[in-house]
From Swiss-Prot:
Signal peptide: none annotated. Pfam families: CoV_E. Its main location: host cell. It comes from Human coronavirus HKU1 (isolate N1) (HCoV-HKU1). This is Envelope small membrane protein. The keyword Transmembrane applies. It is found in: Host Golgi apparatus membrane. The keyword Ribosomal protein does not apply. One of its GO terms (biological process) is viral budding from Golgi membrane. Isolate N1 belongs to genotype A.
Length: 82
């Protein structure tokens, strides 16, 4: 028959607690890392929304205005100036 002393039992319980705490701490770090990645992706989306999209809109609108202005306004000919 196997004799288990209190010291052996406490050692096994301590090892289990250390293993559980290690898993919990690892889980906390993994969740924090994933949350950081998600936050970075959201910030990149905001960067796109607030910086790139307005500049693309201004560029496209400027091109539209330039084309419409250059099509509508034709420089006068030399006959008109005489």
């Amino acid at each position: 028959m196997v004799d288990l002393f209190f010291n052996d039992t406490a050692w096994y319980i301590g090892q289990i607690l250390v293993l559980v705490l290690f898993c919990l701490i690892s889980l906390i770090f993994v969740v924090a890392f994933l949350a950081t990645i998600k936050l970075c992706m959201q910030l990149c989306g905001f960067c796109n929304f607030f910086i790139i999209s307005p500049s693309a809109y201004v560029y496209k609108r400027g091109m539209q205005l330039y084309k419409s202005y250059s099509e509508q306004v034709i420089p006068p000919t030399s006959d008109y100036l005489i």
